[in-house]
Amino acid sequence: MRHETRTTGGTTLAILHTETSADAWDEARWQEARGRTRELLDSYGVVLLRGAGIPDVTAFHAAVSGFGGALIESYRGGNTPRKTLSDGVFTSTEYPARYDITLHNELSYARGWPDRLYFCCLDAPDTGGATPVCDGEALLGALSPGLRERFAAGVVYRQYLHGGAGLGKSWQDTFETDDRAVVEEFLTESGADFAWAADGGLRVAQHRPGVRKNPRTGRDTWFNQADQWHPSNLPDDEGELLLSLTDSVDDLPHWVTYADGTPLSDEDLAEVRAAQREHKLIESWQRGDVMIVDNLSVLHGREAFTGTRKVVVSMT
């Protein structure tokens, strides 16, 4: 198997050409692919298996299971709309095709997060639809010292989850239950602050680091999705519309502040997004491709698209 690399800014994607048809995979071939993938992940943080020829969810599940690590079988507490397809395999998102999904580290707002993300393209879109990636160390290094310090002090992710009718996801959908005791146990174990609202909704605040140490390199890396949780991230004028429909920012489905409660300024958000654009790498999907992402090292997103796109994901 041969590999090549592609680089944008400080982000490098390793492309491993498997050069094997879907019906020619055997255990020896998979062992070779897994070994090469681990080596490349250690070097670059993201690897694309090109030509893997994965045809369906069943084959993807079998392939991912062989990489080791227990598959995460529940997305409880997650804010992204997605569907479960089989044990440990989900749609990557149900977010509308006409919108981009900005760069982020998966579940960085949670107490626990996946180490690795495995994406597989079962149907490639007509246009767009790539899963862009961005090196977290490069992103952090592109920010001014003062901004790095503010994120290093931490961020607070705030949610208002309605009880069945309202903006955004309900707490029932978010936590996959209508049992308040189950929700309270989950949030308590997560170290989150929470309170039930008089209208049946739920307020949640999670204090998390904005920067973490990357054990692979020993250096600090960006690890948050604060800009994604800010209403200015919403497409078109939806952020302003949401603000006009609520009495307070605390009633927004998502809201984020620095650790001391200070809101993120427009200038800070602009600086973060400019750095993301500088280091964002885009590689179009081909049917059967598999992309493996070290979640602590590399951010990912989704480009808007046309046509039919089916990209599934597993997490370990």
Locate predicted features.
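Conserved short loop/turn motifs at secondary-structure junctions
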Residues: 51-55, 170-173
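Glycine-rich nucleotide phosphate-binding loop and flanking beta-alpha elements
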Residues: 55, 109, 299
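Glycine-rich loop at the start of a catalytic domain that most often binds anionic cofactors/ligands
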Residues: 54-69
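A gly/proline- and charged-residue-enriched helix-loop-helix capping module
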Residues: 74-105
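Generic hydrophobic/packing signal
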Residues: 67-71, 107, 121-125
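Active-site environment of non-heme Fe oxygenases that use a 2-His-1-carboxylate facial triad
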Residues: 1-29, 42, 97-103, 112-316
